[in-house]
Amino acid sequence: AKAAYDHVERSLSSADGGEDNKYNHQRYFRTALAFKKFWEHEDIRSFLCMLNKHPKRNDKFLDINVLYYLFELITERLCDVRKTVCLLDGEGYDDKKSDIAKKLTNGEKLFVISVYQTIGAGQNLQYDIPDAVRDSLIQTNSWNRSTKKDFDAIYLDLPTNLTVNIW
């Protein structure tokens, strides 16, 4: 835990964020906790992690390499987190979305990171049900059985700017 804390602290030391640094620091650990839940639960094969900012290489507020480091600590380097974690951003969005759907349909376990603005309203992230899961599904209603499924789990990081305060 100390190694993780120190690594995040070093990555944020160059950021002149003041009070925002506390938020950025906590965002790293909230995201790592979401990944930890994904990693610990075998029944979670697809996890959508929605943040307010895309993690990018060498970004002083949310560096993807720092997240990879935290995720490697969680997995104890038992897997290549760069193959398990997918970034769904605006650059090549349709190709990335298609690739993610294909991997999930093939039964791969994926942790997908995106932001609210990229996914946007009306985007359908469902994917074809993997064969390994199809036979274990139980239909609980009279709706037509679908060949698509949603993500198994989702994490929403402080979606405060998406809702309107009416009081």
Predicted features, each with a name:
Residues 1-120, 127-136, 143-150, 160-167:
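Conserved C-terminal RecA-like helicase domain
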